[in-house]
Amino acid sequence: MIQQQTLLKVADNSGAKEIMCIRVLGGSKRKFGNIGDVIVASVKSATPGGVVKKGDVVKAVVVRSVKGVRRADGSYIKFDENAAVIIKDDKQPRGTRIFGPVARELRDKEFTKILSLAPEVL
């Protein structure tokens, strides 16, 4: 469950290490986001020489969440950390590599490029 002020680890090589959620997109009353939701975030820490810098406002898609998401067969999938991938306006990732597993629910939201770059899809 991602809300305002939530810190997320960045799971790509765009240069950011940690981001903080500013807003969950998808309606003015929307308070929480989960796997597959797009958020607006601020970069809190970054590596030198990266594409994004500290203080940049970016869009990101949540790929791992501590709060589980329920699947159609009744099972739940949850992770040990909250993580996101920084994206462009056309839903393409800014980085060229994805680190760690991602959830299969991203396919329903049409983030196929992230799924193809990920080392493991759960």
Swiss-Prot record:
A family per Pfam: Ribosomal_L14
SUPFAM superfamilies on file: Ribosomal protein L14
Annotated keywords: Ribonucleoprotein, Ribosomal protein, RNA-binding, rRNA-binding
GO CC annotations on file: cytosolic large ribosomal subunit
Highest taxon, organism lineage: Bacteria
GO biological process, one term: translation
MF terms (GO), sorted A to Z: large ribosomal subunit rRNA binding; structural constituent of ribosome
Subunit structure comment from the entry: Part of the 50S ribosomal subunit. Forms a cluster with proteins L3 and L19. In the 70S ribosome, L14 and L19 interact and together make contacts with the 16S rRNA in bridges B5 and B8.
UniProt-listed PANTHER family: 50S/60S RIBOSOMAL PROTEIN L14/L23 (PTHR11761), LARGE RIBOSOMAL SUBUNIT PROTEIN UL14M (PTHR11761:SF3)
NCBIfam families recorded: rplN_bact
Role this protein plays: Binds to 23S rRNA. Forms part of two intersubunit bridges in the 70S ribosome.
Family per record: Belongs to the universal ribosomal protein uL14 family.
The name this protein goes by in its record: Large ribosomal subunit protein uL14
